[in-house]
Amino acid sequence: MKKWGFLLLLTGLLCACAGVQEAQNLANCKFALRNVELTDYNLSSLGFEVVIAITNLNRKQPASLKHFEGKLTVNDEYMADVTLKDIRIEPNTVKNARAKLTVPMSAFNNKLLGLISMNSATLDYHLTGTMYFEGPLGVEIPVPVNIGRYGNGNF
């Protein structure tokens, strides 16, 4: 009976260590807002595709992102919430995580709406939020991130 308890404890610790290792790998990843593209438009809303590049700098270990919740702004005005789930980044690679957004026209003022519809070079997109990775025993651990800018403010 004691052997089974010890074996169960050892198995639990090994699983927890693996989860902590993948979480550490995620903390060492680089994040960049790669693209924000207008994909659809109609009288009531605009559709966008947001691409976030996640670079795993570790040469041997994968990194795992449980989920990400963030806010996308354009020219310092709130645009939409961005959510990503269950992303695995293989060692020494870049993963382009994609999120599709539908934003009501009422979210934009007329000037900003015109700039977006023309894909103006004066647009400045910014993404911030919280990424969550799975820690020991399935506990989600939050880490605030500033993924960065794409557009006019990104020199």
Predicted regions and their residues:
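Intrinsically disordered, low-complexity Pro/Gly/Ser/Thr-rich segments with frequent PxxP/GP/PP motifs
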Residues: 74-109
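Short structured motifs
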Residues: 32-38, 81-85, 111-114
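Positively charged n-region of N-terminal signal peptides that target proteins for export
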Residues: 1-4
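Sec-dependent N-terminal signal peptides
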Residues: 6-10
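C-terminal motif of bacterial Sec signal peptides marking the signal peptidase cleavage site
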Residues: 13-16
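Post-signal-peptide N-terminal segment of Sec-exported extracytoplasmic proteins
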Residues: 26, 31-71, 133-142
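Terminal connector regions
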Residues: 105-155
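Bacterial signal peptide processing site
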Residues: 18-21
